């Protein structure tokens, strides 16, 4: 059988009505959301199915919703005899989904933890003062240089290395605007402002990371049953303290997604299954390693087909 890995998406993959078809076919989806709702104290399934979108898109609600969606899909896979992947990795928030599915963190603990992570992130930067933008069609070094020159005493830096030619920058709103303009002047095809309220993975997140460290210390971490490639160092840690440390640093350091996918391919992985709503990571895969194939497990037909392999 082809060596495969599971990858778990981060924020941006949520939509109102996500996983409705999966829930109709697999009862464990709603059962998983019921567990999360009990941990949070509100009906998370109702929020994901009925919205409104502006509520679902609040980061402290987006994060538990996406984590739960990914865990629900993984449970469908397990329940129907799916084989264990060779490796796992998650993009930003998705790293928590991977750690739950690899048995490192208890699901209910993780749901509460990512809700707090969202609140800490929102508290760290007053709404309207931070921004993120996707830079399309410019090399990493030129983007880094544009950010350095545009900072002018503020914060702006590359924060998501999503694929060659697709890098997200984040920081103070004005600095992100200046850096976006500088990137276009340097030859970028586009600089697209992202509809987010929090500038994730930049230095402005350090206060949130300090609060997160306190909460992470309260949670039991087990050794992973499947290697999980982390975002910040592109390494598979097995020690609980090392995993905690990587999650703290992840909040104010770039997501090294390009390197993570390259690493998995170098370890012999040939196919990536995206375990979550949407197809963001599936779309990035070919741009990173053209010999890798990828598919999403977010529809009953796709799940059934993958389980038959």
From Swiss-Prot:
It catalyses: holo-[ACP] + malonyl-CoA = malonyl-[ACP] + CoA. GO terms for molecular function: [acyl-carrier-protein] S-malonyltransferase activity. SMART domains: PKS_AT (SM00827). Signal peptide: none annotated. Transmembrane segments: none annotated. The active site is at residues 92, 201. GO terms for biological process: fatty acid biosynthetic process. Its EC number is 2.3.1.39. Keywords: Acyltransferase, Fatty acid biosynthesis, Fatty acid metabolism, Lipid biosynthesis, Lipid metabolism, Transferase. Disulfide bonds: none annotated. Pathway: Lipid metabolism; fatty acid biosynthesis. GO terms for cellular component: cytosol. Belongs to the FabD family. PANTHER family: MALONYL-COA-ACYL CARRIER PROTEIN TRANSACYLASE, MITOCHONDRIAL (PTHR42681:SF1). This is Malonyl CoA-acyl carrier protein transacylase. It comes from Escherichia coli O157:H7.
